[in-house]
């Protein structure tokens, strides 16, 4: 009963904002100036807008317009220049030298140079609470060789480094602004991207305005970008149809057929690099030992065997995902074929529960309030019940769920990870002891050893062997029960051109314009 009131409230507020926007646009047209605003609907409200501290997928969507990176990826996952124009490795693969783009400034007018890169990498590594520390662990020092040349020194070869620098660890913020506001930088971030931060209203909007001195300004065609979090996929779609949004991410799979039949809109689809899974508290806090799911791997195996992944994909995702049981899709060349997706087996699940001495185990599944998360949780709940599990669904606002996961205040957590171009980005931070995204609290020295070897090994065949070993060992403990790898589903006004679907699911604003 609460949800319909919420939906009407959101529509009403969007309608009021739309009316104001029309009035402003009319005024500008009279003055002979046509303002171009791009309005993007997000499935969640991002967490803190500081690349060092952030950890949400929707935050990365905002950062794509706000904070340039040293390098980026393209549609085929090739590493391409952004703030760095070229790079070269030393023969022993322990030094990376990067040449930087000249003439770049931050949004406060400060110069981007090698000293700024050194500051940012060190900030990522050393700032209290940094979520980038583990990503850059092998980088031991950074040297500014000259104004536009920077050297990253590593303790050992680090195969994922370029992929790491193509994401938040490679995002550059203004050293001056970060030093002036060390604790609340995320409330007013200063970067070097095509748009600068102007306003944020929690759960309502993030407003960015075009940065006049952007190095690639000829490729930017909007004066303003407004990100609006709209948790309910139905409302998100309604706002696209009414013209209050120009682009929406994570369209409900069930809405795709009707969108395809509407000539006003375009649909884009691409398989993600990440996964949807259920993270289980196996050691994050004392709460892990209070529930048989957390303390006994046999109960976790029984839970997994109660699930039909293909059924989940069909019922909850309308087929818009690939069933999976690892941090990578079965289509990925690094997928461990020695650990295939298990079939549902209710009889075996019940036998394991009996062996563990557990009758009708009960646990709470914390689930973000997103539409797809709720659908999947309900299907999981129904399937697990057939094996004797009593799953309680706890719907929690996304940023709040992350904070609770940090504290270990959960039994199981429905969490999607958007994925990275290198497998390490889906793996190390989730299973390395004391890593910031290790919400399960899983920690084993032999796993850490294999993780570190996979990072220092550059030969793909040898890395694949290490990933095979990791998959086999982690599968026995099941700190994460992987479910599937979804398709990113976008819908947007057909007048919007230049949209480039890339497997990381992020929207690049460069080249976007209304035709």
Question: What does each model-found stretch correspond to?
Answer:
Residues 75, 101-131, 141-143, 189, ...:
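Extracytoplasmic/periplasmic ligand-capture domains
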Residues 30-35:
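Sec/Tat signal peptide C-region and signal peptidase I cleavage site
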Residues 41-91, 122, 190-191:
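N-terminal lobe/hinge region of extracytoplasmic solute-binding protein
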Residues 1-14:
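N-terminal secretory signal peptides that target proteins for export/translocation
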Residues 483:
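Active-site-proximal polar cores
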Residues 20-28:
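Hydrophobic helical h-region of N-terminal Sec-dependent signal peptides
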Residues 490-515:
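Long beta-strand-rich cores associated with HINT superfamily self-processing modules
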Residues 1-3, 99, 133-176:
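Surface-exposed binding/hinge segments that line
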